[in-house]
C-alpha cells in the first residue's frame, strides 16, 4: 500500500513544477499517470518517462488498469504522486471503484470553451459540474498551484458557472 499519496490534476503531467515542488513535498518515489489515451500511446508514454529522473518509478495506466493495480497492491510500498490530465478521468476512476479522497487541482489550460477559474486553471461547464458532483460525493477537491500556496475551495467555480450546482 502506498505509504503517502498525493493526487493532482495538471494537464502538463510530468514537468518541472511537479518534479521540483510537488514530488519533493511528499518525497515521492513513484509517479502514477492515469490516462486512457496516453496509456495506449507508446511515444507519449516514453516522453513522460524521459521527463522524470532516472531513479523515479513511473507507471502510466488506463483507468481500468489503475483500478486493477490499486486493488492488487495500492500502487506499491512507495510514496506515490498520482497525476491526471483532466477531471473526467477522476470521475471514471470513481465510477470504476477507485476513489481518491483528496484531489489538488493545478493547471488546466484555458482553451476552447474553458473559462478561467483560478490562475492558470480553466474549466468548461461540464468539467465544473463534474468537480462539484465529485465534491458532493465526499471528495475534498481544492485549487493549489504550488505546495506553499493556500488551498482554495471550489466556491469560485460556482461564481463563474452560477447555473452549475
Give the predicted meaning of each segment.
Residues 59-106:
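Ordered, amphipathic secondary-structure segments that act as subunit-interaction surfaces
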Residues 10-13, 62, 123:
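A general structural motif
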Residues 39-41, 66-67, 110-113:
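Short gly/pro/ser/thr-enriched loop/turn and capping motifs at secondary-structure boundaries
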Amino acid at each position: 500500500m502506498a505509504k503517502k499519496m498525493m493526487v493532482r490534476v495538471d494537464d502538463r503531467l510530468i514537468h518541472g513544477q511537479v518534479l521540483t515542488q510537488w514530488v519533493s513535498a511528499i518525497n515521492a518515489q513513484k509517479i502514477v499517470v492515469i490516462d486512457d489515451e496516453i496509456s495506449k500511446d507508446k511515444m507519449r508514454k516514453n516522453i513522460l518517462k524521459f521527463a522524470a529522473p532516472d531513479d523515479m518509478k513511473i507507471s502510466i495506466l488506463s483507468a481500468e488498469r489503475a483500478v486493477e493495480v490499486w486493488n492488487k497492491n495500492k500502487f506499491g510500498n512507495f510514496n506515490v504522486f498520482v497525476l491526471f490530465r483532466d477531471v473526467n478521468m477522476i470521475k471514471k476512476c470513481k465510477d470504476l471503484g477507485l476513489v481518491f479522497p483528496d484531489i489538488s487541482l493545478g493547471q488546466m489550460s484555458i482553451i476552447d470553451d474553458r473559462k478561467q477559474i483560478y490562475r492558470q486553471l480553466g474549466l468548461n461547464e461540464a468539467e465544473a459540474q463534474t468537480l462539484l458532483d465529485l465534491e458532493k460525493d465526499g471528495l475534498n477537491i481544492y485549487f493549489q498551484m504550488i505546495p506553499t500556496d493556500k488551498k482554495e475551495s471550489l466556491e469560485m467555480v460556482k461564481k463563474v458557472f452560477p447555473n452549475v450546482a
